[in-house]
Amino acid sequence: MGEALRGLKRTIMCGESRENNIGEKVTVMGWVQRKRNLGGLIFVDLRDRTGIMQIVFGEEINKEAFEKSDNVKSEYCIAVTGEIVKRQSPNNDMETGAVELKGEDIKILSESETPPIYIKEGLDASENIRLKYRYLDLRRPDMQKIFMIRHKTCKVVRDFLDENGFLEMETPILTKSTPEGARDYLVPSRNYKGMFYALPQSPQIFKQLLMVSGYDKYFQITKCFRDEDLRANRQPEFTQIDMELSFVEEDDVIELNERLLAKVFKEVGGIDVKLPIERMPYKIAMEKYGSDKPDLRFGMEINDLTEAVKNSEFKVFKGAIEAGGSVRAIKAENCATMGRKQIDKLQDFVKTYKAKGLAWIAYKEDEIKSPIAKFLTEEEMKAILEKMDAKAGDLILIVADKNNVVFESLGALRLHIAKELDIINKNEFRFVWITEFPLLAYNEEEGRYQAEHHPFTAIMDEDIELLDTEPGKVRAKAYDIVLNGEELGGGSIRIHDSKLQEKMFSVLGFTKEKAWERFGFLLEAFKFGPPPHGGLAYGLDRMIMFLAGTENIKDVITFPKNQNAFCPLTEAPNVVDENQLEELGIKKIEKED
């Protein structure tokens, strides 16, 4: 049984002791990292979230404490009182390596069984074990550094927004289901049998209502929930830095957030963000990089060869152009010697993005090698090489198809090759704003338009008339902030006119009745002098991944779910008692074999 503190107070953290503390009598508390018994002396490395302190116990220092210290084992939780002294053999690898603590008194606060994982940096254990024993995994110094970074990030964000006149306000977690996009997590109501709350996918509607209420600068750091298939680096519950402002346009929101990003990345990560951040229209991003989340740390931009081969009789090129598509290519420098097997793998790669194939031209020192050379005239080959600014040693990779297939496949291929060639500077942070997104996308299966972001996004002033005639060409007052090929956050200016909002719902295929059934409270609010407003939300978890230098979202969330949205620690979700279900008016339907 562990000893009680009985009024004993910790006076210093393990990682805080330095030479200027020599001579001080202190009390430290933490976990035993390791113990070394050298006969007349016992050395204990004691760890807390700030670091490690070496403690030395000896018969000459205090016999009782020396004998008691021999009983401690790895991960025992102990308290030690003694004097900080200069270390005879300094350890330059430890921040506290110049000093040690002479252990004069020890309390064993609690014992520990042998841990299923070793508490150290760079743990080599399976993800399932780490998540099952997450409370032990979180003791590791590299994990504790991550959560100190997370804390500091939230503090810097709060301080900055407070200094800029924002109010931190909370919005409901139990809210109304408005199914558009990802599935909602539903919560049954006990008072209203057969009815459900939804957990919010974002605070979107409530923060807009706060603008109507006159709270012109709102923010919160809040949980959001999406019941979707968990691709890499997705979690069913995640955290947003959410904000909304009244009486603003795009430039106002962007300028404020550039200053916020510069402050966060400098103060937390020591990273300089060059301002103003580059802005790139969606159309340019897709045409040059094949993605609305372009990684700008390397070149290999997509080039349009359609004009150069518009008269070609090569049926692959001709067919794509006649069908309204295009012929585009990327250039992989110094890759002309790539073998046939490697190129075959690249062809298989683009087919996963629905491309029918991948044409290639290897520009070698003494020849141009290509399986499509025989289908091209000398002038067409020359035009391609000139357009690609090709030099000896370059490999040109070409896709001819519908534009969306060309963009997606070449964009993915560009990233794939850059990673294979290891040409991405991992120490560089390249921000870019993507602007002028399409407002709508046509869903062929449902035969209707869907909002690219959400149905509350404002329309670019010059495109409003197109909403009636060519909805697919309408651009949104939307903006995403992208860092190194990852979306860090996104936002937009919102519609604040009830008639225009109703029209937007109509274009999306909502009847007036359906729109009012789902969003009537918002449309009603818009009758009472709503201000122009807009905002932005960051994925806090992804931001911390960049600042902490980890590629796994589970590393930055204290108790994450696994890839199947299951918690190995608590075994949630779990079966609940029948009487709980009965109280909620829910009956289980057994699966038929």
From Swiss-Prot:
It is found in: Cytoplasm. Residues 204-207 are annotated as: Aspartate. PROSITE patterns: AA_TRNA_LIGASE_II. Keywords: Aminoacyl-tRNA synthetase, ATP-binding, Cytoplasm, Ligase, Nucleotide-binding, Protein biosynthesis. GO terms for biological process: aspartyl-tRNA aminoacylation. It holds the Pfam family GAD. ATP binds at R226, D227, E228, Q235, E487, G539, L540, D541, R542. L-aspartate binds at E180, R226, H453, R494. It comes from the Bacteria. It catalyses: tRNA(Asp) + L-aspartate + ATP = L-aspartyl-tRNA(Asp) + AMP + diphosphate. Disulfide bonds: none annotated. Its EC number is 6.1.1.12. Belongs to the class-II aminoacyl-tRNA synthetase family. Type 1 subfamily. Homodimer. This is Aspartate--tRNA ligase.
